[in-house]
Amino acid sequence: MSQATKRKHVVKEVLGEHMVPSDQQQIVRVLRTPGNNLHEVETAQGQRFLVSMPSKYRKNIWIKRGDFLIVDPIEEGEKVKAEISFVLCKDHVRSLQKDGHWPEAFSQVTEKDNNDRNRQTQPELPAEPQSSGEESSSEDDSDLFVNTNRRQYHESEEESEEEEAA
């Protein structure tokens, strides 16, 4: 199987299905990445340990601090105690919260992170009244990447009216 085909199948698997953890699996949050395809994670109970990334995810899926994973325990591991079995994206997290499979300790963390991101990405503009509630959750741009290395230019309505009049 070529590298492109492998990548296509791995990405399709990660983005496509909604997985519920089994009895042995755990939902964990990534704290840091010390390297060599190892990630330090924290469970809902506060236990910290290392997890390894299987070779099918390497160079295909990137994991960053704050992401959530489903891991399988490794019995013989001393430092590395689990292996990543699934990477959870925001849609998976919402689905697990709705189904009641999400740990309470992480629900507080996700709400706090969402509030922090909204404060960072939303410029402080005067509040405008909402239009007739036609906006759906699919139009929510709060999870889009914002490049912080670029200046944010905000054009006011007064400036645009002056330009149109000239």
Swiss-Prot record:
Signal peptide annotation: none
**GO terms for CC?**
nucleus
Q: State the protein's purpose.
A: Plays a role into cellular response to oxidative stress. Decreases cell proliferation.
Q: Which CDD domains match?
A: S1_eIF1AD_like
Q: Which gene encodes it?
A: EIF1AD
> Which molecular function terms from Gene Ontology are attached?
RNA binding; translation initiation factor activity
Q: Which organism is this protein's natural source?
A: Bos taurus (Bovine)
Report the SUPFAM superfamilies cross-referenced here.
Nucleic acid-binding proteins
Q: Give the family, as the similarity comment puts it.
A: Belongs to the EIF1AD family.
**Domain S1-like stretches:** 5-89
Q: Which InterPro entries match?
A: EIF1AD, NA-bd_OB-fold, RNA-binding_domain_S1_IF1, TIF_eIF-1A
Which subcellular locations apply to this protein?
Answer: Nucleus
Motif range (Nuclear localization signal)? 6-12, 56-65
A Pfam family that the UniProt record links to this protein: eIF-1a
The entry's protein name is Probable RNA-binding protein EIF1AD
